[in-house]
């Protein structure tokens, strides 16, 4: 009976899989990529050392250390060839790794040819430890070699990186998530005692430019990941400079920790819950506790190299908590390789030939404005002072010019040629990028070429060209004029009121739909997306090649007031284009029917996301707040005429499939003339969001939108409506009052109680609340403009303490 009980235990001890969990790995032990034993485990099984397949590649394996108990088996170390050749060791499937009887660790192929070894001898045994360190030891227990001394892109708790003597004591980012080749970023523990992040050349690793550092000096400094989960830079005088933090979310017993220099150049500290569904930050996934630098898109502006992203692309955040940098191509450009976006973008059209005459170039190319994006240091010529039309013309006619950048406030123009570098999307960018692309009459991005100045100049250029070329252009112009005149006649015969004034002011060509077209597109106005005072919004789909989803707003009960709202909406949004404004695709003005056709927003209005049972991530709310602010900045300061929205509320902020915020519903908007700062109008807007001056006999300005934005900003911070009658504490009924009380008492944390992400980022929470209180000042002159608001939200300027707002709250009758 005893023998029967012991027999299963004996089989288990002899099992090759179980044998790999022993503390010491003896001489003669062997691993094979596809054999019964492909890895050696640490005693707890938390870590493994051995052969790790590369996702999406079945031709070779890595020699690696990885987290063994989590689903994605995250790799924390991988073997490289030599210091002089830091390329990864690619292991064919027929190879084997052996701790040989003569005391060496050796990778060999089927023929016995050695492919890699760590260049040490006299090894008595090896150990895969629960710290994630794989160690080769001598008979006396001394360390001969260890992975902690040869870091790849990650450090683990208890790991220390001393002052750099050779390159492999630094961290080198991967080229991409699934590409373990040496990447474009380096974290260097320097001999001068400075810890610095560098942009580097691929594949050589030559340093380009430092983009973050501790600015410290002194031999003997070291980068430490303590056993308590704290990452810091230790100086010789005992000073500790915190690089990242454990954020107090739990003990080391509850979470796996790592700090990685990611492929986007950010050094992040991550945690992962050891038990399923035990993560405070939600889910079985790696969550970033902190990162350096805070904004990689803004951190790198390099004289050489492409910047964070590849050439001719630009960097933007993905809006998640981990703030992964995402690379995008500008319009009419495409990635060289969609799977390897770091390679950059190329023009998706035939480039401008230098053999073209000026008039031909003007006919073949046009400019498209892009807002909130910049490519610093790529300019080769500068003009000042100059108008925007002339700035654009000079780029269009020159074959070297890929884009022009214009600063309205200084009347400065920069011309840029390919390749473009250091591209980034930034809230503070106030310049307009004019991208040169092939001419298209149907372009929605086209800069108006109908200005009198541009027309006069074009006339002179055509007259100055050859007779044959001039004749060709005149013929084309005549044909286009006939087409436009015919279109105009067709439109005006179908309409009861003229829209020529609105459309002539618009820089964007709007499509005119028939009522039958929209009735068919909406399946008989079947699916309702929402309803308001003046009409209902339906979901539809166009019968184009892309089967474009649309939102169709119907204007009911056609009266002078609703007719006016329809005209205002067409005139206002029809002349705007910005990533944070909903795009008007067209309209129907047939007999008594008034319909507006918009791009469809997948995630609906903000109130649906914000006031649902599940709270959106803090970084998502930050991303939305910055987007709304950016949209208002465009309306107030960057349009040809200032636009006051007058009815901003969560229902009028829509979210696309990437949760990018877009301002909508311009039916109550007011246009200000160039010399106007205020306008008189009746009370507009929604209770709870309207500014105090609406109730006074004074003109209103863009500051009414600033006030409404302040209310929405607090709703985004607190994840609750401005007025909540069903609250336990009566002082919390009105969020504007409550936020002011919390700010004055130094208890901002109460506004985000239970929101661990926001609590961790409490300084930004305080900054946002402070900005909101400035926006809520009763005196409009005390409120900042939207340029100042975006700067304060972005942390670009200091924010003084706001005065205590007046007790007037527009949410009350």
Swiss-Prot record:
One of its GO terms (biological process) is response to other organism. ATP binds at residues 529-537, 553. One of its GO terms (cellular component) is membrane. Residues 488-813 are cytoplasmic. GO terms for molecular function: ATP binding; carbohydrate binding; protein serine kinase activity; protein serine/threonine kinase activity. The chain crosses the membrane at residues 467-487. Residues 20-466 are extracellular. Residues 1-19 form the signal peptide. Glycans are attached at residues 24, 57, 164, 168, 219, 242, 407, 441. Residues 293-346 form the EGF-like domain. It is a single-pass type I membrane protein. It is found in: Membrane. Residues 22-149 form the Bulb-type lectin domain. The keyword Transmembrane helix applies. It holds the Pfam family B_lectin. It catalyses: L-seryl-[protein] + ATP = O-phospho-L-seryl-[protein] + ADP + H(+); L-threonyl-[protein] + ATP = O-phospho-L-threonyl-[protein] + ADP + H(+). Keywords: ATP-binding, Disulfide bond, EGF-like domain, Glycoprotein, Kinase, Lectin, Membrane, Nucleotide-binding, Plant defense, Receptor, Serine/threonine-protein kinase, Signal, Transferase, Transmembrane, Transmembrane helix. Involved in innate immunity. Required for the expression of defense-related genes PR1A, LOX2 and CHS1 upon biotic stresses. Required for basal resistance to the fungal blast (M.grisea), bacterial blight (O.oryzae pv. oryzae, Xoo) and the herbivorous insect brown planthopper (N.lugens, BPH). May be involved in several defense signaling pathways. Involved in the promotion of seed germination. Required for the expression of alpha-amylase genes during seed germination. Involved in resistance against the brown planthopper (BPH). Belongs to the protein kinase superfamily. Ser/Thr protein kinase family. This is G-type lectin S-receptor-like serine/threonine-protein kinase LECRK1. It comes from Oryza sativa subsp. indica (Rice).
């Amino acid at each position: 009976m005893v023998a029967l009980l012991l027999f299963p235990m004996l089989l288990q001890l002899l099992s090759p899989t179980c044998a790999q969990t022993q503390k010491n790995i003896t001489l003669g032990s062997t691993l094979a990529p596809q054999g019964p034993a492909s890895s050696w485990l640490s005693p707890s099984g938390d870590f493994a050392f051995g052969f790790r397949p590369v996702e999406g590649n079945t031709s070779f394996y890595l020699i690696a250390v990885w987290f063994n108990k989590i689903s994605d088996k995250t790799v924390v170390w991988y073997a490289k060839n030599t210091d002089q050749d830091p390329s990864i060791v690619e292991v064919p499937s027929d190879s084997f790794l052996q701790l040989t009887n003569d005391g060496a660790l050796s990778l060999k192929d089927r023929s016995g040819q050695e492919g890699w070894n760590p260049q040490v001898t006299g090894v008595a045994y090896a150990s895969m430890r629960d710290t994630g360190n794989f160690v080769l030891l001598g008979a006396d227990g001394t360390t001969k070699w260890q992975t902690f001394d040869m870091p790849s892109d990650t450090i683990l708790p208890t790991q220390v990186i001393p002052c750099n003597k050779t390159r492999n004591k630094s961290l080198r980012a991967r080229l991409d998530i699934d590409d373990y080749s040496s990447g474009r970023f380096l974290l260097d523990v320097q001999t001068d005692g400075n810890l610095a992040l560098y942009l580097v050349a691929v594949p050589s690793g030559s340093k380009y430019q430092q983009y973050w550092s501790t600015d410290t000096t002194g031999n003997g400094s070291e980068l430490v990941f303590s056993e308590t989960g704290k990452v810091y830079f230790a100086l010789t005088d005992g000073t500790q400079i915190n690089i990242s933090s454990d954020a107090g979310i739990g003990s080391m017993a509850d979470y796996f920790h790592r700090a990685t220099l990611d492929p986007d150049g950010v050094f992040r500290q991550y945690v992962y819950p050891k038990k399923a569904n035990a993560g405070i930050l939600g889910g079985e996934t790696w969550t970033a506790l902190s990162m350096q630098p805070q904004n990689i898109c803004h951190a790198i502006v390099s004289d050489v190299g492409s910047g964070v992203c590849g050439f001719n692309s630009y960097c933007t955040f993905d809006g998640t908590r981990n703030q992964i940098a995402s690379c995008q191509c500008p319009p009419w450009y495409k990635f060289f390789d969609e799977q390897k976006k770091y390679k950059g973008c190329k023009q998706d059209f035939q480039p401008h030939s230098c053999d073209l005459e000026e008039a031909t170039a003007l006919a073949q190319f046009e400019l498209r404005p892009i807002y909130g994006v910049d490519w610093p240091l790529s300019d080769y010529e500068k003009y000042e002072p100059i108008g925007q039309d002339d700035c654009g013309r000079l780029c269009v006619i020159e074959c070297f010019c890929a884009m022009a950048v214009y600063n309205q406030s200084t009347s400065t123009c920069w011309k840029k040629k390919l390749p473009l570098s250091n591209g980034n999307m930034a809230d503070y960018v106030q310049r307009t990028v004019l991208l040169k692309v092939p001419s298209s009459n149907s372009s929605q991005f086209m800069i108006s070429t109908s200005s009198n100045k541009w027309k006069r100049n074009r006339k002179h250029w055509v007259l100055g060209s050859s007779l044959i070329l001039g004749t060709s252009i005149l013929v084309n112009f005549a044909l286009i004029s006939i087409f436009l005149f015919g279109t105009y006649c067709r439109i005006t015969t179908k309409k009861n009121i003229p829209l020529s004034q609105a459309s002539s002011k618009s820089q964007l060509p709007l499509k005119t739909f028939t009522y039958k077209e929209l009735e068919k597109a909406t399946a008989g106005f079947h699916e309702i997306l929402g309803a308001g005072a003046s009409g209902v919004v339906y979901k539809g789909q166009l019968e184009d090649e892309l089967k474009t989803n649309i939102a169709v707003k119907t204007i009911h009960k056609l009266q002078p007031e609703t007719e006016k709202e329809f005209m205002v909406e067409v005139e206002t949004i029809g002349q705007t284009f910005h990533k944070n404004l909903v795009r008007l695709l067209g309209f129907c003005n047939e007999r008594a029917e008034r319909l507006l056709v918009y791009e469809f927003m997948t995630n609906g209005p903000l109130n649906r996301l914000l006031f649902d049972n599940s709270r959106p991530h803090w970084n998502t709310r930050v991303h939305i707040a910055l987007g709304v602010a950016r949209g208002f900045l465009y309306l107030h300061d960057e349009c040809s005429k200032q636009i006051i929205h007058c009815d901003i509320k969560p229902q009028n902020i829509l979210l696309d499939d990437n949760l990018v915020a877009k301002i909508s519903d311009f039916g109550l908007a007011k246009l200000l003339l160039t010399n106007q700062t205020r306008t008189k109008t009746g009370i507009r807007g929604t209770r709870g969001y309207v500014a105090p001056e609406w109730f006074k006999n004074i003109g209103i300005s863009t500051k009414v939108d600033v006030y409404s934005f302040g209310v929405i900003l607090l709703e985004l911070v607190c994840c609750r409506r401005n007025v909540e009658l069903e609250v336990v504490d009566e002082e919390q009924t009105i969020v504007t009052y409550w936020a002011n009380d919390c700010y004055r008492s130094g208890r901002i944390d109460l506004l985000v109680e239970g929101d661990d992400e926001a609590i961790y980022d409490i300084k930004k929470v305080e900054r946002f609340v402070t900005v909101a209180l400035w926006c809520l000042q009763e005196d409009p002159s005390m409120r900042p403009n939207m340029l100042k608001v975006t700067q304060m939200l972005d942390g670009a300027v200091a924010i003084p303490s706001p005065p205590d707002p007046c007790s007037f709250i527009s949410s009350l009758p």
